[in-house]
Amino acid sequence: MAYPFQLGLQDATSPIMEELTNFHDHTLMIVFLISSLVLYIISLMLTTKLTHTSTMDAQEVETIWTILPAVILILIALPSLRILYMMDEINNPVLTVKTMGHQWYWSYEYTDYKDLCFDSYMVPTNELKPGELRLLEVDNRVVLPMELPIRMLISSEDVLHSWAVPSLGLKTDAIPGRLNQATVTSNRPGLFYGQCSEICGSNHSFMPIVLEMVPLKHFENWSTSMI
């Protein structure tokens, strides 16, 4: 859950988000070291007069500044590719949920259950109950079982949308005429908030997403009551 004046990432709630957080820290350290080196060299150039204006050829230096960046890029690319394939693959999902973006709300269909589908609209500010979050609450939450792999099929009925829940490491475009896939796995129960992350019109800011992750037994009771 985000909090005011937050500068870092939200707490990781899924294995994918944990990997993304680690990759962020790994890449940020490389960027920090390179930036420090560049600033150090610039400061030396500005504060000293030790220059080589007559140097026309330096093959050793050119070799170093060609090979070293290539090695650094490999160190960044390999972990990135690993996470990319982890996000793409899903084996034996226990549940499939189809998500459709509309102007300006989301609709959900639990394809493993007959007639279990609903629309999810933002709760207006004047209808909020004490403790609820402005611009983030919805009238129908997406209830899912925790600690189990769930497949989300995401598309759109009209314009481009993007289904995003930061604490779960999820952000998938909703494209008309195309089904995109995302994997949802939560390590713990709770409410996880997201929003449409693709500008889709005048009410783009009023398309919140709320996932309620619960134990499997509670999910079965909820699904039975909804059918």
From Swiss-Prot:
SUPFAM superfamilies: Cupredoxins, Cytochrome c oxidase subunit II-like, transmembrane region. It comes from the Eukaryota. CDD domains: CcO_II_C. Disulfide bonds: none annotated. Mg(2+) binds at residue 198. Its cofactor is Cu cation. It is found in: Mitochondrion inner membrane. Binds a dinuclear copper A center per subunit. Cu cation A1 binds at residues 161, 196, 200, 207. Keywords: Copper, Electron transport, Magnesium, Membrane, Metal-binding, Mitochondrion, Mitochondrion inner membrane, Respiratory chain, Translocase, Transmembrane, Transmembrane helix, Transport. One of its GO terms (biological process) is ATP synthesis coupled electron transport. Belongs to the cytochrome c oxidase subunit 2 family. This is Cytochrome c oxidase subunit 2. The gene is MT-CO2.
